[in-house]
C-alpha cells in the first residue's frame, strides 16, 4: 500500500506533518485544525491518529477540533502529560512500541524542551520513497535544538545523542521551520566551516523561493548541527545560552 509524507506550513513557522497510507492519515502536532481538515477532506482521507510530541499550544491547539470531525482517531501522547494533553486516548512512554497504520512506531523519551517531550521513530515505513522517519517536535531542529523550558542541558545532550544514533538516512521532521536562522547563528560561530556555510547557502536559496528546508536528515544534522556535535552537556548549555541571547548584526 502506498505511503507518503507531506509537510503543511501553518502560522508563522510551524510545520504540521501528515503521513498518509492508503485512505488514512496520521497528523503530527496539529497547531490548528482548519488547514489540516481542508487538506484531508480535499483528498478524501480519514484521520486515523494524531501524534503529540508535547503539550505546547502550537502543537496541540488543533487536535480537539479534529477530533470533533474524526472522533474515532487515536491521540497518542505522553502518559506523563495527561493533565496537559487531556484528550489523549493512547498514553505512551519512551521505549514503548505502538502500531499506527500497520507500522511499528517507537516512542523515544527526549525530555528537555519540556519535561514530558517524546519523539516518534518509524524505522522501516513501507513505501519505496519513504526512508526512516523521525517526528521530533521541538527537541531537534535543523541546525538547532529546542529551548530548555522545563529541562536541563544534560537532558538535551542525552536526547540529541540518542537521536544521533539513528540511521543517517532518517528523515528529521521537526515542527518548526527555523533552519535559516539557526544556520545564520551557527555560521557566525564557525565562519570557516565550509560544510556549514554551504548548507546555509542552500537553505537561504530554498527559503528565498518560499520552499521548506525540511525534512532534514540525521546524517545532515550530524554534519551541520552544532548542538548535536556538542561533546558534553556543558558545551551544549553554553551554546544554548549563547544562542538564546544572540542577535544578528
Swiss-Prot record:
<dbReference type="Pfam" id="PF00753">
    <property type="entry name" value="Lactamase_B"/>
</dbReference>
<dbReference type="GO" id="GO:0019243">
    <property type="term" value="P:methylglyoxal catabolic process to D-lactate via S-lactoyl-glutathione"/>
</dbReference>
<dbReference type="GO" id="GO:0004416">
    <property type="term" value="F:hydroxyacylglutathione hydrolase activity"/>
</dbReference>
<feature type="binding site">
    <location>
        <position position="56"/>
    </location>
    <ligand>
        <name>Zn(2+) 1</name>
    </ligand>
</feature>
<keyword id="KW-0378">Hydrolase</keyword>
<keyword id="KW-0479">Metal-binding</keyword>
<feature type="binding site">
    <location>
        <position position="138"/>
    </location>
    <ligand>
        <name>Zn(2+) 2</name>
    </ligand>
</feature>
<comment type="function">
    <text>Thiolesterase that catalyzes the hydrolysis of S-D-lactoyl-glutathione to form glutathione and D-lactic acid.</text>
</comment>
<dbReference type="InterPro" id="IPR035680">
    <property type="entry name" value="Clx_II_MBL"/>
</dbReference>
<dbReference type="InterPro" id="IPR017782">
    <property type="entry name" value="Hydroxyacylglutathione_Hdrlase"/>
</dbReference>
<protein>
    <recommendedName>
        <fullName>Hydroxyacylglutathione hydrolase</fullName>
        <ecNumber>3.1.2.6</ecNumber>
    </recommendedName>
</protein>
<dbReference type="Pfam" id="PF16123">
    <property type="entry name" value="HAGH_C"/>
</dbReference>
<dbReference type="GO" id="GO:0046872">
    <property type="term" value="F:metal ion binding"/>
</dbReference>
<dbReference type="InterPro" id="IPR050110">
    <property type="entry name" value="Glyoxalase_II_hydrolase"/>
</dbReference>
<feature type="binding site">
    <location>
        <position position="58"/>
    </location>
    <ligand>
        <name>Zn(2+) 2</name>
    </ligand>
</feature>
<comment type="subunit">
    <text>Monomer.</text>
</comment>
<comment type="similarity">
    <text>Belongs to the metallo-beta-lactamase superfamily. Glyoxalase II family.</text>
</comment>
<dbReference type="InterPro" id="IPR032282">
    <property type="entry name" value="HAGH_C"/>
</dbReference>
<feature type="binding site">
    <location>
        <position position="138"/>
    </location>
    <ligand>
        <name>Zn(2+) 1</name>
    </ligand>
</feature>
<feature type="binding site">
    <location>
        <position position="54"/>
    </location>
    <ligand>
        <name>Zn(2+) 1</name>
    </ligand>
</feature>
<feature type="binding site">
    <location>
        <position position="59"/>
    </location>
    <ligand>
        <name>Zn(2+) 2</name>
    </ligand>
</feature>
<feature type="binding site">
    <location>
        <position position="113"/>
    </location>
    <ligand>
        <name>Zn(2+) 1</name>
    </ligand>
</feature>
<feature type="binding site">
    <location>
        <position position="176"/>
    </location>
    <ligand>
        <name>Zn(2+) 2</name>
    </ligand>
</feature>
<keyword id="KW-0862">Zinc</keyword>
<comment type="pathway">
    <text>Secondary metabolite metabolism; methylglyoxal degradation; (R)-lactate from methylglyoxal: step 2/2.</text>
</comment>
<dbReference type="InterPro" id="IPR001279">
    <property type="entry name" value="Metallo-B-lactamas"/>
</dbReference>
<dbReference type="InterPro" id="IPR036866">
    <property type="entry name" value="RibonucZ/Hydroxyglut_hydro"/>
</dbReference>
Amino acid at each position: 500500500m502506498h505511503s507518503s509524507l507531506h509537510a503543511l506550513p501553518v502560522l508563522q513557522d510551524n510545520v504540521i506533518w501528515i503521513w498518509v497510507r492508503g485512505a488514512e492519515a496520521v497528523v503530527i502536532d496539529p497547531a490548528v485544525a482548519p488547514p489540516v481538515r481542508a487538506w484531508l477532506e480535499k483528498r478524501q482521507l480519514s484521520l486515523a491518529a494524531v501524534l503529540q510530541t508535547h503539550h505546547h499550544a502550537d502543537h496541540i491547539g488543533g487536535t480537539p477540533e479534529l477530533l470533533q470531525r474524526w472522533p474515532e482517531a487515536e491521540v497518542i501522547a505522553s502518559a506523563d502529560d495527561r493533565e496537559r494533553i487531556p484528550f489523549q486516548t493512547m498514553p505512551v512512554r519512551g521505549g514503548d512500541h505502538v502500531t499506527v497504520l500497520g507500522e511499528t512506531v517507537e516512542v523515544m523519551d527526549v525530555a528537555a524542551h519540556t519535561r514530558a517531550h517524546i519523539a516518534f521513530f518509524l524505522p522501516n515505513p513501507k513505501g519505496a520513497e519513504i526512508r526512516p522517519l523521525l517526528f521530533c517536535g521541538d527537541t531537534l531542529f535543523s541546525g538547532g535544538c529546542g529551548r530548555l523550558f522545563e529541562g536541563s542541558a544534560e537532558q538535551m545532550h542525552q536526547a540529541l545523542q540518542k537521536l544521533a544514533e539513528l540511521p543517517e538516512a532518517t528523515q528529521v521532521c521537526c515542527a518548526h521551520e527555523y533552519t535559516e536562522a539557526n544556520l545564520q547563528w551557527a555560521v557566525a560561530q564557525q565562519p570557516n566551516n565550509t560544510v556549514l556555510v554551504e548548507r546555509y547557502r542552500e537553505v537561504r536559496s530554498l527559503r528565498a523561493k518560499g520552499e521548506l528546508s525540511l525534512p532534514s536528515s540525521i546524517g545532515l544534522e550530524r554534519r551541520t548541527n552544532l548542538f548535536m556535535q556538542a561533546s558534553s552537556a556543558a558545551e551544549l548549555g553554553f551554546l544554548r545560552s549563547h544562542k538564546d541571547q544572540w542577535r544578528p548584526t
